[in-house]
Amino acid sequence: GTYVVRQTKAATGVKLAPDFTVLVGETDGEDKPLIVHNEPVTAYLRVVKVDADDGEVIPWGGAKFEIYDPDGNKVTQKVTYPKAETISVFETNDEGYFITPLVLPYGEHYRLVEIEAPKGYKLMDAPLIFDVTPETIKVDTENNIEYVEVIAGDKAVQPTVDSMATGVNDSKELLPLKETTITDKVDCTDVIPGKTYTVKGHLRLYSTGEPLLDKNGERITASKTFKADKDFSGHVEMTFTLDASNLAGEKIVVFQELYRGENLVASHTDIEDADQTVSVVAPEIKTFAKNGAEGTKDSKIVYSDSKASIVDAVSYNGLIPGLEYTLLCNLMDVEAGEIFKDADDKEVTATVTFTPEAAEGAVDVTCELNASKAAGKKLVAFETLSYDGEEIASHKDIEDEDQTVEIKNRPRYSHEEPKDNPTTGDTGIGPWAVLFAAAVFVTSGFLMFSYRRRKKDTIQ
């Protein structure tokens, strides 16, 4: 008859022989030997790199390993494809695993040693022990290979965050505007490629250390969610929008926290960190109004001419250089308390636009006016400094003498009676009297000449 022969136990290090059949017929009673061939136990090694916290595969290469056999010898494998080389270090691919190019022989207590961790992770604390035995071998039926799989988990490196907060034009300053922005450039280091993070930030007042609140009493916050791809630069930006109109002279500090999922993994909350700090400037202006005409003895007197000018010399400090500002000058009637209207019934105002190179400086604003009907009036220059249409400083003191000029008629010279008892060097004769005497002398001479001429003509 026909029999199936099945091996139920094999020697150490070899596989069970596959089943085979034998035909037993009528014999002469002699035994016939059967030859059984046992293949040695071998398998490829497949190592998968995972995150030790969540068990997810780390989906990029860079993890490097060495393999040591049960006798403590480093495993090397010689290959000819794609090039001839001897491999002693095995590296994970971009899918987070590697398979040895050649099989490993039967053995217990192989050691897998990580010599370089993937980006964002720490090296394994200890080698991983694995066996190449029939009990540990898996079969990949699709590729018809046998392998031993080892899952190698790494702990993530603790990430860090640092930042540089900036205001206008990448400076460290803000203008006290109703709406302005702070840009926070955050550097995230040791984040895990492939993982998703969120940077959250809020603003604090340096003077109190307390959170800066908006008009609704809520924290002023910003956030940015990003995925740390393989080529992630580590840089993200957040923008905070705030009302700084009442914060002139204050310092604002940005605090950041880095989350991976719901877990806080890093923070930067140093109230003394200058890199995280932006200052709100406190612009100030002072003025000195004067007659714009040249050669005037008293600069605070403006004559009642139809074409008069008043120059307001404005000094400023606390500006952010490189920005364009506008100065508006309104001439105010001190008595009326309103903008002065000249003889042409025009309100007298003037503007000048300038871009300072330094935080402090000066600029002139010239007001042209018809002052022919303004004699006796006092005018005060009111100044408003604005940026992008929003007032940031002003000087409007109706009683400020430096801002004040007086309109007067030009002086007229007239004949004066001689003074009694003139002193030495004083003839008592005014300049007009001298001119009058000269005119009389010339006229008398002319009349005498004409009389003599007529008399001579008559005799002839």
Predicted features by range, described:
Residues 1-460:
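Solvent-exposed loop/turn and edge beta-strand elements of beta-rich ligand-binding domains
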